[in-house]
Amino acid sequence: MIVLTEQERRLLSLVQPVAEGLGMEIVRLRVQGGRRPHLQIMAERAGGAPTGIEDCARLSRGMSPVLEAADPISEAYTLEVSTPGIDRPLTRPGDFARWIGHAVRIELARPIDGRRRFTGTITGEDNDGAHIELDDETKLVAAVHEMSRASLVLTDELIEAARVAGNLPPQPEDDEDMLADFEIDESEDEEDPETGDVQ
């Protein structure tokens, strides 16, 4: 998988068996800091089958007791489970092979000739890594574990491919709302001192 922190690797080891038991796959796991940490998990049904909010809710319910028991994040945090969306992240070996011919953005964990960020078209994937034809017509080959970020670029061709695969809602106007989020606040309810409302 793409480069993870030690904490993210620990979290992945906890939630991945839950996802597999439900016939799902973890696409990306990320912990974002701030006043309240945010644990973001993107997942899809095995094999890239169309995934909906019910799948996310089921996965979230399955993961919550596991995370609560292990307590991998010591402070209050928010858990978000969502589908990858159209301009999905590419994080695992094999992800690039599914999207040959589509535009991609990549950020490497370590720079090549002083450069870390690249944009181009996926031309293949093999044991050496993903093959990308860059916008300047040069070529890049990089393994997934050498990347810190990678995602598809939203184009008309990508939207059509997602529609054909059944990964778009029936209403065209909903293209930008493709993520099916299911959020759980892992902290106790708090009262707003100004309004008295429970948050």
Swiss-Prot record:
Biased composition (Acidic residues): 172-199
Gene Ontology biological process terms from the UniProt entry: ribosomal small subunit assembly; translation
Pfam families per UniProt: DUF150_C, RimP_N
Entry coiled-coil feature ranges: none
GO CC annotations, alphabetized: cytosol
InterPro entries listed in its UniProt record: Ribosome_maturation_RimP (IPR003728), RimP_C (IPR028998), RimP_C_sf (IPR036847), RimP_N (IPR028989), RimP_N_sf (IPR035956)
Region (Disordered): 165-199
Top-level taxon in the UniProt lineage: Bacteria
Gene3D superfamilies tied to this protein: Ribosome maturation factor RimP, C-terminal domain (2.30.30.180), RimP-like superfamily, N-terminal (3.30.300.70)
Record keywords, A-Z: Cytoplasm, Ribosome biogenesis
Localisation: Cytoplasm
SUPFAM superfamilies documented for this protein: YhbC-like, C-terminal domain (SSF74942), YhbC-like, N-terminal domain (SSF75420)
Similarity field: Belongs to the RimP family.
Job description of the protein: Required for maturation of 30S ribosomal subunits.
NCBIfam families documented for this protein: PRK00092.2-5
Protein name: Ribosome maturation factor RimP
Organism classification: Bacteria, Pseudomonadati, Pseudomonadota, Alphaproteobacteria, Hyphomonadales
Gene: rimP
